[in-house]
Amino acid sequence: MSSKKGLLYFRDGELLAQSGEARVYRFMDFLHLDIGPGHNLWAIESELEDYVWQINDRPKGDCLEIGLGLGVASKYILSCPKVKTLTTVEINKDVIEVQKQANPINDKRHLVLNADGLIYMYATDRKFDFVFVDCYALIDEETLPMIADYSRACEKVLNPDGEAVGWFDKATPEEFVGEFYNLWEIK
């Protein structure tokens, strides 16, 4: 009999890809991305339902995504019928590598750049019709100022009728929900 107490994706799952400190495991029919020696869970393929709810049918035209993760949101955005292109900016080259190995996106409309998303938005002259920002792990008093920086940068890269959405963590404490949503009311 096993002495294991519960199942863990990194112990009981199959390692599919590794680059640097980024790893992708398949566990219970879903991909799991973790980063670092402490197995910091960064993304789970089952988040698709959350992305569908949050992003909905907003993606259209030229789209920008900040944060790649497993590419789940990328695939959803690219599945939207009005999307012409998707540029995804990911700061961690190891995340880009393991995503390519474990969950590749074979769509000529998709471009992945290894860069800091905030710097990219301030440096680029490109304009986008939709921006999705998903590069933070939680929403609280420490991350809200950074999220506000991304929201302001979206104003620079959005076309006049464009929309921006920030990833919403369902576990966000109630005291931060209103402030978070107010950041994404971009005019």
Locations of regions flagged by a protein language model:
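C-terminal substrate-binding/active-site "lid" region of AdoMet-derived donor-dependent transferases
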Residues: 124, 137-187
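Conserved SAM-binding motif I beta-strand of class I
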Residues: 85-90
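Conserved acidic residues
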Residues: 61, 84, 129
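A conserved beta-strand element that flanks and buttresses the S-adenosyl-L-methionine
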Residues: 132-134
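Conserved SAM-binding loop of SAM-dependent methyltransferases across substrates and taxa
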Residues: 70-82
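Class I SAM-dependent methyltransferase core
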Residues: 65-66
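Class I S-adenosylmethionine
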Residues: 1-62, 71
